[in-house]
Amino acid sequence: MARLGRFQMATASGLVGCLFLYTPAGAEPAYVGIVREYVEKLVRPTVEMPLVVKAIEEQNSKFGDVSEMDMRVLDETYRAEVARGDLQMVKALMAKSVSQYLKSKQDDSQGTILEFFVTDCHGLNVGQSGITTDYWQGDEDKFLKTFSLASQDIYIGRAERDESTQLLETQASFVVTDEKGIPIGTATVTIAIDAL
């Protein structure tokens, strides 16, 4: 009986997870390049649309001098509403045309995009495709490793299997710029790696 190599075994068994076991130290996992290409080709162009840029710019004007304490209060209020099922902030966000646009792009992805949201320059959600766990992203890597560093790179988080769906997922985030190339916010998508 012929022996299969590690890569052939992973391919033959259809287990993307096996590829993670054989990633050399210091090398990025196999899914990172695939996710980066998907985001660069299909997600970034949808975020560069005037509807999204304008919505972010409007919120930046509205919350121009918001304090960190105020952002934390907004975030705690949002989280409490989600926990109680009293979704006033969520409903207001979901009623925005930018949220409806992001939801349509998620739906068009045929299960590849599981979540899609954009933030302002503080990390506060501007638009979202569904209920997020929190309203302020400014204290998380998805914001700190993109907007806070003025990076043009796509930050891709660690892949994890969602316990409820059993899908292998990762989040990818990048800076959104205005027409002059000035950073104004961020975009984040949760990607079902199994769907790529």
Task: Label each residue range with its predicted role.
Residues 84-103, 131-160:
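Extracytoplasmic/periplasmic sensor domains and loops in membrane signaling proteins
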Residues 1-13:
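Bacterial N-terminal signal peptides that target proteins for export
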Residues 110-113, 168-170:
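Short, small/polar residue-rich loop motifs at catalytic or cofactor-binding pockets
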Residues 115-121:
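Short hydrophobic alpha-helical segments used for membrane anchoring or interfacial signaling
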Residues 10-22:
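Bacterial N-terminal signal peptides
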Residues 124-129:
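Amphipathic coiled-coil signal-relay and dimerization helices
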Residues 26-89, 111-112, 195:
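Juxtamembrane extracytoplasmic/periplasmic/luminal helical "stalk" adjacent to the first N-terminal
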